[in-house]
């Protein structure tokens, strides 16, 4: 009987010691996973899809973000986060604790990079821009019809490809066109989104001034309604670069447009062909789409550069010729 009491007492003593030790261990571990890290600058780390908590712990130790992979694994198991860590590129802030890192990886707040595609670029120019970005995976994207992409600032992660961004740009353009088309002015001289996109691309290339877009669009709308050729220089430039680069270049002409260029034989040349060209000449931004679908109402039929980055508008050819003469005088003075 005494032996039973002895062993029962010993068991209870050891159990108590174990509980105390366990509680002490939990208390220690709880403090350790909350203790600030010993690194004083941010650490960039990429977690590949399918990487387990053990592999992540080793990456973190190698990068200098943690000292003990085992403690990281135990912390992940203890908090239940070990199966919730998301792949991606992360920036770990200076002094982050193990718990901070687990919370970051569970949140999926990956590093967001941005690329700005400016308005008026051609598809080819956009493809070239994205192809030069070293932090994007590069694939061979399909060349979409001109004007398929909406110029904007796009977020991306290092795991994404140039094709992923192009796909988002294409979806964004379709979405913008659907939205703006439903709010269009009722008396436009065209009946399809495709035609609106063509004219928006011309407006985009004609002016970079926000307060001029609707007025320039109004000029082209008036000319279309009256059956007057658009006579837009950017359409000729597009025709020239399209031909000179064998349907691939579609960038800047690299020289001043000459009078003889206005006779260039191309369906895109709006000096030789009435109405709209067969397709867009660039990728217009949202503002140009809005301008074309809700143009300024006026009776202007002409415009020419004013020498200060904007344009001067005219109702008659006589008035326009006077403005052209003034522009040529300004240009001559600048070239002296």
Which role does the model predict for each range below?
Residues 22-182:
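Signal peptide-directed extracytoplasmic domains
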Residues 15-20, 63-64, 87-89, 272-277, ...:
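N-terminal start-of-chain detector that recognizes signal peptides
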């Amino acid at each position: 009987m005494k032996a039973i009491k002895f062993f029962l007492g010993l068991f209870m003593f050891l159990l108590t010691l174990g509980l105390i030790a366990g509680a002490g261990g939990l208390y220690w571990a709880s403090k350790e996973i909350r203790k600030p890290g010993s690194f004083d600058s941010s650490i960039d780390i990429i977690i590949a899809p399918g990487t387990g908590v053990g592999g992540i712990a080793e990456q973190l130790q190698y990068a200098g973000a943690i000292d003990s992979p085992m403690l990281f694994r135990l912390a992940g198991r203890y908090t239940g986060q070990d199966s919730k860590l998301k792949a991606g590129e992360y920036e770990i802030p200076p002094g982050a604790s193990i718990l901070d890192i687990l919370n970051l990886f569970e949140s999926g707040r990956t590093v967001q990079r941005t690329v700005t595609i400016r308005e008026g670029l051609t598809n080819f120019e956009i493809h070239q821009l994205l192809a030069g970005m070293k932090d994007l995976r590069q694939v061979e994207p399909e060349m979409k019809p001109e004007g398929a992409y909406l110029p904007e600032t796009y977020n991306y992660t290092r795991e994404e490809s140039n094709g992923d961004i192009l796909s988002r740009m294409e979806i964004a353009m379709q979405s913008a066109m659907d939205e703006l088309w439903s709010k269009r002015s009722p008396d436009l001289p065209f009946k399809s989104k495709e035609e609106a996109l063509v004219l928006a691309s011309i407006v985009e290339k004609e002016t970079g001034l926000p307060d001029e877009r609707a007025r320039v669009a109004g000029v082209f709308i008036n000319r279309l309604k009256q059956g007057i050729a658009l006579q837009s220089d950017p359409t000729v430039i597009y025709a020239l670069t399209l031909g000179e680069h064998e349907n691939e270049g579609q960038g800047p002409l690299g020289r001043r447009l000459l009078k003889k260029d206005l006779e260039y034989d191309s369906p895109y040349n709006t000096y030789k062909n009435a109405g709209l060209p067969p397709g867009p000449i660039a990728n217009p931004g949202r503002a140009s789409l809005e301008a074309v679908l809700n143009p300024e109402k006026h009776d202007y039929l002409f415009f020419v550069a004013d020498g200060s980055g904007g344009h001067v508008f005219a109702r008659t050819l006589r008035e326009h010729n006077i403005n052209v003469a003034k522009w040529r005088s300004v240009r001559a003075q600048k070239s002296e």
